[in-house]
From Swiss-Prot:
This is Aspartate 1-decarboxylase. It comes from Mycobacterium sp. (strain KMS). Belongs to the PanD family. GO terms for molecular function: aspartate 1-decarboxylase activity. The modification Pyruvic acid (Ser) is found at S25. It catalyses: L-aspartate + H(+) = beta-alanine + CO2. GO terms for biological process: alanine biosynthetic process; pantothenate biosynthetic process. Binds 1 pyruvoyl group covalently per subunit. Its EC number is 4.1.1.11. GO terms for cellular component: cytosol. Substrate binds at T57, G73, A74, A75. Catalyzes the pyruvoyl-dependent decarboxylation of aspartate to produce beta-alanine.
Length: 135
């Protein structure tokens, strides 16, 4: 049996730009893509914390160190600059791999710089004072 599992997420990133007339996708700072083990063209789900919108698109690489999180194409109607988002990638794997897999969970600051990298999707780092763990 195959299971679809959390592969990686970038938690509470701030959208820095949007371009309605771009062909689509989400532009992500290359440093964050590396931290989250994302590659260009990989499917990602965007969850907008501010308005509850969810959408599926694909990642493209932004300038390294820029902090860019850019919403492109029609998604710009749903997600806006300044919104807090969670970027999620899932992987499909066999049961044994799924049970052992360690996702990459990236927390960022207000400038979209990595402040914590972990593997527990429910863990909240000490620096995230506004968040509560479900555990």
């Amino acid at each position: 049996m195959l299971r679809t599992m959390l592969k990686s997420k970038i938690h509470r990133a701030t959208v820095t730009q949007s371009d309605l007339h771009y062909v689509g996708s989400v532009t992500i700072d290359a440093d964050l893509m590396d931290a989250a083990d994302l590659i260009e063209g990989e499917q990602v789900t965007i969850v907008d914390i501010d308005n509850g919108n969810r959408l599926v698109t694909y990642a493209i690489t932004g300038a390294r160190g820029s902090g860019v999180i850019g919403i492109n194409g029609a998604a710009a109607h749903l997600v806006h600059p300044g919104d807090l988002v969670i970027l999620i990638a899932y992987g499909t794997m066999e049961d044994a791999e799924a049970r052992a897999y360690q996702p990459r969970v990236v927390f960022v600051d207000a400038d979209n710089r990595q402040v914590h990298l972990g593997a527990d999707p429910a863990m909240v780092p000490d620096t995230a004072v506004d968040l509560m763990s479900p555990r």
